[in-house]
């Protein structure tokens, strides 16, 4: 069984993916993490990703699909797709890639959050460069200021989490990703979660309830 988490940057997809991995043994497919890995290794694909990310723009479909395809060769079941696909072209490409392994997207969860809440969340976000855990100065403060709860690594702010770049990302999301909602409503089991006033745990319980596991 494979599932997808849809929603704007900052809606909590990463937090839900973390819960699903830790509590239900799913495997997270975070294209952000996959791209950052390519960047850290200074691969050709990574250098191309870096150029677009530094400008606050989405990486083109062709590059992202290549990175995902590399991953699917070794992992193609009990996956969580977090932040990918972002466009109809990516969605159709993903379905074709999964079909090679007789797999599909079984559930799509759309986490809907107000834009002003999203901006506040993202600009207050800190991440651990070692284990990739995410914290927030407003909603999920680390136990010790500036340090990761899990490995004591100094937390950092992602370069694409500045206010200007966040606004660009949200606008691009509206233009490119919102059409996916209609597409997946007819191609998978689609569940919308209104999360403005829900805690991360409440969102997780809704997801778990739908999965019936």
From Swiss-Prot:
Its EC number is 2.7.4.3. It catalyses: AMP + ATP = 2 ADP. It holds the Pfam family ADK_lid. GO terms for cellular component: cytoplasm. AMP binds at residues 31, 36, 57-59, 83-86, 90, 158, 169. It is found in: Cytoplasm. It comes from the Bacteria. One of its GO terms (molecular function) is ATP binding. InterPro entries: Adenyl_kin_sub, Adenylat/UMP-CMP_kin, Adenylat_kinase_CS, Adenylate_kinase_lid-dom, P-loop_NTPase. CDD domains: ADK. Keywords: ATP-binding, Cytoplasm, Kinase, Metal-binding, Nucleotide biosynthesis, Nucleotide-binding, Transferase, Zinc. Residues 30-59 are annotated as: NMP. Pathway: Purine metabolism; AMP biosynthesis via salvage pathway; AMP from ADP: step 1/1. Residues 124-161 are annotated as: LID. GO terms for biological process: AMP salvage. Consists of three domains, a large central CORE domain and two small peripheral domains, NMPbind and LID, which undergo movements during catalysis. The LID domain closes over the site of phosphoryl transfer upon ATP binding. Assembling and dissambling the active center during each catalytic cycle provides an effective means to prevent ATP hydrolysis. Some bacteria have evolved a zinc-coordinating structure that stabilizes the LID domain. Belongs to the adenylate kinase family. Monomer. Catalyzes the reversible transfer of the terminal phosphate group between ATP and AMP. Plays an important role in cellular energy homeostasis and in adenine nucleotide metabolism. HAMAP family: Adenylate_kinase_Adk. This is Adenylate kinase. The lineage of its organism: Bacteria, Bacillati, Mycoplasmatota, Mollicutes, Mycoplasmataceae. The gene is adk.
């Amino acid at each position: 069984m494979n599932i997808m988490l849809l929603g704007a940057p900052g809606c909590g997809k990463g937090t839900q993916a973390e819960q699903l991995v830790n509590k239900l043994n799913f495997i997270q497919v975070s294209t952000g993490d996959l791209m950052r890995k390519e960047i850290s290794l200074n691969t050709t694909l990574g250098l191309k990703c870096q150029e677009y990310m530094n400008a606050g723009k989405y990486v083109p479909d062709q590059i992202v699909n290549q990175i995902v395809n590399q991953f699917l060769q070794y992992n193609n079941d009990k996956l969580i797709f977090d932040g990918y696909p972002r466009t109809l072209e990516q969605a159709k490409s993903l379905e074709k890639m999964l079909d090679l392994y007789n797999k599909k997207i079984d559930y799509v969860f759309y986490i809907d959050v107000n834009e002003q809440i999203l901006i506040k969340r993202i600009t207050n976000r800190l991440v651990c460069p070692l284990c990739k855990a995410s914290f927030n100065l407003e909603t999920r403060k680390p136990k010790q200021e500036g340090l990761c709860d899990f490995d004591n690594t100094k937390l950092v702010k992602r370069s694409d989490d500045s206010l200007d770049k966040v606004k660009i990302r949200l606008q691009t999301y509206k233009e490119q990703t919102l059409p996916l909602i209609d597409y997946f409503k007819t191609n998978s089991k689609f569940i919308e979660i209104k999360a403005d006033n829900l805690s991360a745990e409440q969102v997780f319980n809704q997801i778990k309830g739908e999965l019936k596991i």
